[in-house]
Structures are given as structure tokens and as C-alpha cells.
């Protein structure tokens, strides 16, 4: 309520009110750092893993067993040997190798706790289209990373020559009270198909550092099994309230009629709309569909 009152003349207050009603709360005691590329982000991620004292949680759509993952895995394995709890949650479609029973058993044999989010077997599962596209790394409940970077060489511009040229994506590091929401999101995903629901309490820090930074942080995430499209609602609100410009970067442009009409209307009322997409596609069909929209 205090945050909403302080921002009563700002569109941010509407978003805060909406998110709070969906149980995603604003935090002021936070520090946020932006990484403009995967190659900038990677060493910070390794450093954060190496700093862990209690636990490390990873939730990723794509984890590819390549040289980048080997470096991450070795850093995680060393922490396990030091007594740090490591949990890995990967998507059954996005991480086909890690999702195999062989690799899951390999992780568990090395002391990891690991689960697969909706395996693609059976193929005709009613949940097949519910995928976990999150990219979250949490260390000790005090620090979290999120953004567009999966765990694969191409995202970090590492390994052999990248067939997609330079991969441009980004990530953010969050420290402070907002990490609470990332813990909540991860543990809810972890417990989705569990027989016994765990108590979250032991993973919640008793205190956080003091971060004298301006602004507020509101992490949020869509629920996998309800009809609320929180992220879409927020994007539509931002588009429809833009006054000067809209800068959009995305690996894929797959928009429905509603979003397309809102973007066209924004441009028609004088908003400068700029959209940046990759020149070299990693999924040709998706690229062609997106190009059809951009050519309209």
C-alpha cells in the first residue's frame, strides 16, 4: 500500500496493484545488476555458484551437456562435495539429454537432487504443451539470476564457432528481499508433481543485506496450470500506455491478433515502435511466422 501511494501519479502504481492482487509483492531493499550478454554473464554465474554456503537451485528450459555445462557442473559438483544442497529442475522438452533416466541417475549419483518438468514421455500427455521456460538460478536465498539465457554454449558465445554468429541475450542479478519470490517460484515448480509437499521455511533467509538503492523490484511468474496470463497482461498494459517509444528485443515474434493490433495502434498514435529480432534464425518455421508479422 505504501508503494502504491507513493507512486499514485505513475503508471507503475497500476502494475504494482495488479501484481500484488496476484500475490507478487514489491520490494525496495534490493540491488539489481544487468548483464547485456551471455559472455559477460557467465563468469559472474560461476563466481556466484562458488560462493554458495547452503544451497543452489537451478530451473532452466534448456540445459545442454556441452563445454559450458561441464564447467557449471564441475562447479556445482564441488559445492555438493562441500555439503551444499544442489537442486536442478529442467524442462522435459527443452533439455532432452538431461531428461533421460540415465542422466537423471548420473546427477543423483553425484549428490544432486534433480527433477524433470513434464517429461515428453508419454508423448500424448495432456500437459505436453505446458513447458517451463524459466531461467532461474538461486544461491542461498540471497542472490538470484534470471533473464533470457539458457545453459548452453550458444547463449554464452563459447565453444566452437557459433552457427548463429553472435548470440545477443541478457540476464539480471537480483540481491535482497526480492529473491524471496524466486524461491517461491522455484519451490512451487519443484513440488508440482511431488508426492510430499515440502515446507519452504528452511530455505527462507532470516535476514538480508542492506541495499541503499533507489527503485523497487517485483519479480513475477505465470502459473503453469491456470488461465491467468500475467506477463501478457503487463506487456499489453505497457504497450497501451506508452507515450514516446517502445523498444522490443526478442528471439521470436509470435503475436496474436490482440497484441498485433495494440502494437499497430501504438505506432498510429505517434509512439516510436522499434523491434529487434535475430537475423539468423535458430528455428526456421518460427522465424518465418514472425517475419510475416513484421512485414505487415
Language model segments and positions:
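Helical hairpin unit composed of two closely spaced alpha helices linked by a short loop
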Residues: 252-274, 278-283
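Acidic, Ser/Thr-rich peripheral helices and adjacent loops at domain boundaries
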Residues: 288-296
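Active-site metal-binding loops of divalent metal-dependent hydrolases
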Residues: 149, 251-252
Amino acid at each position: 500500500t505504501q508503494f502504491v501511494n507513493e507512486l499514485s501519479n505513475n503508471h507503475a502504481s497500476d502494475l504494482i496493484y495488479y501484481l500484488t492482487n496476484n500475490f507478487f509483492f514489491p520490494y525496495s531493499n534490493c540491488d539489481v545488476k544487468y548483464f547485456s550478454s551471455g559472455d559477460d554473464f557467465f563468469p559472474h554465474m560461476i563466481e556466484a555458484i562458488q560462493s554458495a554456503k547452503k544451497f543452489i537451485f537451478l530451473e532452466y528450459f534448456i540445459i545442454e551437456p556441452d563445454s559450458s555445462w561441464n564447467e557449471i557442473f564441475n562447479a556445482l559438483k564441488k559445492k555438493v562435495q562441500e555439503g551444499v544442497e544442489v537442486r536442478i529442475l529442467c524442462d522435459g522438452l527443452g533439455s532432452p539429454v538431461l531428461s533421460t533416466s540415465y542422466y537423471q541417475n548420473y546427477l543423483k549419483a553425484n549428490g544432486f537432487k534433480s527433477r524433470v518438468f513434464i517429461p515428453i514421455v508419454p508423448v500424448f500427455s495432456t500437459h505436453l504443451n505446458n513447458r517451463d521456460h524459466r531461467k532461474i538460478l538461486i544461491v542461498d536465498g540471497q542472490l538470484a539470476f534470471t533473464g533470457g539465457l539458457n545453459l548452453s554454449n550458444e547463449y554464452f558465445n563459447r565453444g566452437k564457432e557459433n552457427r548463429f554468429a553472435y548470440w545477443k541475450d541478457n540476464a539480471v542479478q537480483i540481491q535482497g528481499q526480492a529473491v524471496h519470490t524466486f524461491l517461491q517460484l522455484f519451490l512451487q515448480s519443484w513440488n508440482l508433481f511431488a508426492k510430499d509437499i515440502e515446507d519452504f521455511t528452511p530455505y527462507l533467509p532470516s535476514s538480508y543485506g542492506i541495499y541503499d538503492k533507489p527503485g523497487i523490484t517485483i519479480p513475477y511468474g505465470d502459473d503453469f496450470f491456470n488461465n491467468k496470463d500475467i506477463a501478457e497482461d503487463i506487456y499489453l498494459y505497457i504497450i497501451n500506455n506508452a507515450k514516446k517509444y517502445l523498444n522490443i528485443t526478442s528471439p521470436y515474434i509470435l503475436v496474436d491478433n490482440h497484441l498485433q493490433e495494440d502494437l499497430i495502434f501504438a505506432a498510429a498514435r505517434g509512439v516510436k515502435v522499434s523491434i529487434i529480432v535475430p537475423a539468423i534464425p535458430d528455428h526456421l518455421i518460427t522465424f518465418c511466422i514472425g517475419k510475416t508479422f513484421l512485414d505487415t
